[in-house]
Design a protein with these regions (language model features):
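Phosphate/oxyanion-binding loops and surfaces in catalytic or ligand/nucleic-acid-binding neighborhoods
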Residues: 21, 81, 109
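SAM/dcSAM-binding transferase cores
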Residues: 96-142
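Conserved Class I SAM-dependent methyltransferase catalytic core
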Residues: 41-99, 103-104
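Mobile active-site "lid"/loop adjacent to the S-adenosyl-L-methionine
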Residues: 9, 13, 18-47
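Short acidic/glycine-rich loop or secondary-structure boundary segments that cap or lie
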Residues: 6, 22-28, 60, 72-74
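Residues in well-ordered beta-strands of folded domains
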Residues: 12, 89, 123
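Conserved SAM/SAH-binding loop
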Residues: 1-4
C-alpha cells in the first residue's frame, strides 16, 4: 500500500530493515509487535524487493540490513526485481567472528561488479563498543 502512494514517481534511495525470519521458521513470538518485526508474514522479502524495484528510478540505490545466512535469498530477490547487489558490508560481533548481519546496497539496473567493504566489528576484546560503532552511534569520546 505504501508503494501505491508513489505511483508514477521514482525514488533515488529506498532503505529497509525487514523481518529477518522466514514465515514458518524459527521460534514464534507471542507478542504481536515482536512477531511482525522479526518474522515474515505481514510482508515477505520478495514483496519488499518488488516494492523497492518499482519505487526506484534506474540507477537508484536500495539499502537493506539482513541476517548473514539469508544473503543468498536477499541477492536472489533483489536480482529478480532488477536490483543488482553492488556493495556488501558484513557485521561481526567481535574480530574474527563470522558475520551475523549484512548491509547490502543494490542498484536498480546496476550492471556488473560487487564491492566488499571492510567488516564492521561491534565489540572489542573487552566487550566494549569499537571506535567504529561509537562513531556510527555518534558518541563524542571517539
Amino acid at each position: 500500500t505504501f508503494a501505491a502512494e508513489y505511483k508514477g514517481r521514482k525514488a533515488d534511495v529506498v532503505v529497509c530493515n525487514p523481518p529477518y525470519i522466514k514465515q514458518g521458521c524459527g521460534e514464534a513470538q507471542e507478542k504481536e509487535s515482536l512477531r511482525l518485526c522479526r518474522h515474515e508474514g505481514a510482508v515477505t522479502l520478495d514483496e519488499i524487493c518488488r516494492a523497492a524495484g518499482r519505487l526506484l528510478k534506474s540507477g537508484g540505490r536500495f539499502y537493506m540490513v539482513h541476517k548473514a545466512p539469508r544473503c543468498a535469498d536477499v541477492f536472489e530477490c533483489m536480482t529478480r526485481h532488477s536490483i543488482t547487489p553492488k556493495e556488501i558490508t558484513t557485521v561481526c560481533a567481535r574480530e574474527g567472528d563470522a558475520p551475523y548481519l549484512v548491509i547490502v546496497c543494490g542498484r536498480k539496473d546496476g550492471g556488473e561488479g560487487l564491492l566488499w567493504h571492510k567488516p564492521i566489528v561491534v565489540y572489542d576484546k573487552d566487550g566494549n563498543f569499537t571506535p567504529t560503532i561509537k562513531q556510527l552511534y555518534g558518541e563524542k569520546d571517539v
